[in-house]
Design a protein with these regions (language model features):
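A compositional/structural signature for long, glycine/proline-rich flexible linkers
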Residues: 2-264
Length: 264
């Protein structure tokens, strides 16, 4: 736990910095830029935006595409990382890092993701902040972002210094421990810290360890990583359009929406 306690900014970790710099390098590859233009054409043809919509498309599109790269590069369940997604533009060593805001960008929340395999075992270690957040969930998703496991930050057992461990594995019971059971289709953790007081609060400190004996393969090679990035760029455009379809299909200023996670 000692390395967790020393972190002043739980988002700006060494792992996060390395991940974002790698994402920027891959994002600028000719192959990925060509894919971006294909997705751009696909998206515009699918939505057919108005002039007003088009006026704010370009900047938002860049963030969605870079956000897809950030997320796609953390998909290997045998070599998981804690990665913060949906960030505003910022700098690393005077290098501009694009924003990665996508989906429902809530400025009061910090979102992090961890890839998980259904048969592997992990330990999520962390340290809770000084006060509980309005919302702090460790949600285990399947491929379609449907919840198959959950533990609330309010229910996590901690030590005297607010440190904790969450055991993630296929076992049905871990008595006396923070535990989430994996099941068929388990894909990743989606972790949300909703801040109350930005002057005094800090996101929870987090790190992930895979139990070595459960590791089932080598890391993704470059070809697979690039294929995954391309797939996510396409997926992010398609999903954003799907989620916005109720607004796109209604007259201007019509807000009678129905939210149904099974069909939206």
């Amino acid at each position: 736990m000692s390395n967790l306690i020393s972190i002043n900014n739980p988002i700006n970790t060494k792992s996060q910095i390395q991940h974002e710099l790698e994402a920027l390098e891959i994002y600028n590859l000719k192959e990925i830029q060509e894919q971006k233009e294909l997705v751009r054409s696909f998206w515009l043809d699918l939505v057919k935006p108005s002039e007003v919509m088009m006026s704010c498309f370009d900047d938002a599109f860049e963030e969605v595409m870079f956000g897809a790269v950030i997320w796609a590069l953390n998909q290997d369940p045998n070599f998981p990382k804690v990665v913060t997604i949906s960030r505003v533009p910022h700098k690393i060593n005077n290098q501009n890092i694009p924003g990665s805001r996508w989906g429902i960008d809530n400025p009061d929340s910090v979102y992090r993701v961890i890839p998980i395999g259904e048969s592997q075992s992990y330990v999520i270690r962390g340290k809770l902040g000084k006060q509980l957040f309005n919302e702090n969930h460790f949600t285990l998703w399947d491929e379609n972002m449907k919840t198959i496991g959950l533990i609330s930050g309010n229910d996590i057992k901690v030590d005297s210094k607010n440190n904790f461990e969450i055991f993630v594995n296929p076992k049905s019971n871990e008595r006396g421990k923070n535990h989430i059971q994996t099941s068929s289709g388990a894909k990743e953790f989606y972790i949300r810290d909703t801040m109350i007081d930005w002057l005094n609060d800090r996101p929870n400190m987090l790190e992930i360890e895979i139990i070595e004996a459960s590791r089932s393969g080598k890391g993704f090679d470059k070809k697979k990583r690039l294929r995954t990035v391309k797939a996510y760029m396409q997926k992010w455009a398609a999903n954003t359009t799907r989620w916005n379809q109720q607004a796109l299909s209604k007259p201007v200023n019509e807000f009678s929406f129905k939210i149904d996670r099974d069909t939206d």
